[in-house]
């Protein structure tokens, strides 16, 4: 399902899954085989694959590959559903902050549970799961293109310009973080293809350097005019007047719009507010967690101290003094009051004029109602 490409993070054909080892980019392009949920868990935890949409799809497909090989399974449909549910719960534990993974697992668990109530053959449970996981892969690409289209058009209207828009992005939110095209980087791609992007700036995104290793790699590959900056140069860039907007992705968005994203996003939002630069979040609806009233309830993953103590995001030589303690959160939470709008595949979520807050629940309900009418 998809041809092998330099910027394709997930290469899947039924019964086979290969993941691009993003730790080795941009100097080496290497794919690893994933044959079971255990392989998928390790690939996600070790950041072979990363990006909230991509890890959800990689997890779902890892289990799809595993169950496709269970031809000798002799259990009941209920036992097959229980097997799938247990594996999904295990996969969710690989990276807890990104809601896409837990959301996908919840939907897939519900599917196999319902299927088990009507099917008499356990293999039908596995087949239903495989079909659903494959649909998620296809839908992600189309959703990302819709995010790009909505975002580019909204920025053009909001900034009241028809060309020469320059933006700053953080971390990696492109083809390498999704099944294809990207979220925040998808908006940048849409701006570029529409002939209205002057330049994209990307941060290096320490300590794992997703910006310098991955986003810069994608932008160069697509021949998008781009400049890499140090994380610490972002405020100076905004002060210079060289950019009109910041566009980032999201790992989890609370009901009020508070957004968890790669560490350093909060810094950018504060700087953007100070300098009068618009700040956008681009993410699929699956990144929104309406069960959380605010960002205070979002669990923040902490990564290995080695990512700071050693070069190359922990994979290289020691660069810090032995004995120093380390605090290395993978994400931070940007308050909704610092966010201009949230760009989704269903449209752009804006704030009400009355109280300058997001009403995300109503937006999602309206989007679902509209979809049922099509």
Swiss-Prot record:
This is Methylthioribose-1-phosphate isomerase. Its EC number is 5.3.1.23. Keywords: Amino-acid biosynthesis, Cytoplasm, Isomerase, Methionine biosynthesis, Nucleus. GO terms for biological process: L-methionine salvage from methylthioadenosine. Pathway: Amino-acid biosynthesis; L-methionine biosynthesis via salvage pathway; L-methionine from S-methyl-5-thio-alpha-D-ribose 1-phosphate: step 1/6. GO terms for molecular function: S-methyl-5-thioribose-1-phosphate isomerase activity. Belongs to the eIF-2B alpha/beta/delta subunits family. MtnA subfamily. SUPFAM superfamilies: NagB/RpiA/CoA transferase-like (SSF100950). Gene3D superfamilies: translation initiation factor eif-2b, domain 1 (1.20.120.420), Translation initiation factor eif-2b, domain 2 (3.40.50.10470). It comes from the Eukaryota. It is found in: Cytoplasm; Nucleus. Catalyzes the interconversion of methylthioribose-1-phosphate (MTR-1-P) into methylthioribulose-1-phosphate (MTRu-1-P). It catalyses: 5-(methylsulfanyl)-alpha-D-ribose 1-phosphate = 5-(methylsulfanyl)-D-ribulose 1-phosphate. InterPro entries: IF-2B-related, IF-M1Pi, IF_2B-like_C, Initiation_fac_2B_a/b/d, M1Pi_N, NagB/RpiA_transferase-like. The record marks 171 as: Transition state stabilizer.
